[in-house]
From Swiss-Prot:
Gene3D superfamilies, per database record: Classic Zinc Finger, Potassium Channel Kv1.1, Chain A
Record keywords, A-Z: Cytoplasm, DNA-binding, Metal-binding, Nucleus, Repeat, Repressor, Transcription, Transcription regulation, Zinc, Zinc-finger
UniProt organism field: Mus musculus (Mouse)
Compositionally biased residues, Low complexity: 227-241
Matching SMART domains: BTB, ZnF_C2H2
This protein's name: Zinc finger and BTB domain-containing protein 42
Gene: Zbtb42
Amino acid sequence: MEFPEHGVRLLGRLRQQRELGFLCDCTVLVGDARFPAHRAVLAACSVYFHLFYRDQPASSRDTVRLNGDIVTVPAFSRLLDFMYEGRLDLHNLPVEDVLAAASYLHMYDIVKVCKGRLRKKDPDLETRTLGTELPGQPPHPLPSWSPAFCQAAPKAKHPSLGVKATHPLPTFGPPSWQVAEQSSGALDLSLKPSPRPEQVHPPCRLQTSLCSSVQQVAQPLVKAEQDSFSEQDSSSPQSADRSPPPVCASAAQGLAVDLEPLHIEGTGSQQLGLPAEPVLDSEELGPSRHLCICPLCCKLFPSTHALQLHLSAHFRERDSVRARLSPEGSVPTCPLCSKTFSCTYTLKRHERTHSGEKPYTCVQCGKSFQYSHNLSRHAVVHTREKPHACRWCERRFTQSGDLYRHVRKFHYGLVKPLLV
């Protein structure tokens, strides 16, 4: 026999007990305000209180002090009423304050509701954020994938890129790279691709043209690549026949895309001996995503994660060519500081600290870096994506260092028990 109203009556009686101060066994302090409450209710509704009462000794559980810089008194009062009533009142209260307090207390249902309210309140907020230009970035981002743009695009094929839509549409289901990201354990808030439209629009070709300014920038870039490879032993036939990858325009005007998978032929990963990349599908990209372009070979990717994997393959191949051991009987030694190294490649990396050489250049903004991993991290700046997610409050960050500082500042009390 079930009593559907039992939960409502139980919450009502607990609310009456809190208002009367009856059986309240703890006090929450927010600034100068005091809120008597029941530990069981707080721990049942908030992960923060659950961990606090689980880890704190019994002698220090009577009073809980919250960070007044993050949790305001009105916001916590509304959240406390929600715990006892099951109803959230956002009238005459900034949603941002409730969102900050709910994130601090790890009340994830409230966090999702507040974020949805903010998106409805200002739907163009995300668009304006993406439209803000960063210093040194091209003024026009790559156009997004859309059927209307695809219909209006010219169906010509650029001979230098060799882009052809030759594969059939794949079956339904999430792409493999998304499944790999979801299985990593981090909470993913990135936009998922929208469902496939019922009517597929006619295919069109991908077409770009090289800007003269980019061609001018490409000259020293190609020369730098040739110089870096010429430093190796000329006896190797592979390094002698190797040619640098082409450089394409960063802001491709008149970019037309296909709703079918795209396959890029010609020079690129095949010449470098890199593993074959998965074919891009419109379902993987989604209508609201921008393309990610490899700064070394101009290959297109649907996400920053896929681009970084591709860049790591680039650098592994380049490092394997450069990291040949020196001839027998000689130890690689720096001529400036006499420091010795295990192989020639590590010596060349060390020499950059003396010369200031920056061989890794981003073709989108022209910024150069001394090491390959710095260029890989920099590529995220142009895509505006935030792949690093906080597992406790759902905030996302562009760089892993920003996530680390956020966790140390706001969630150190939660991380410390996990490290013991």
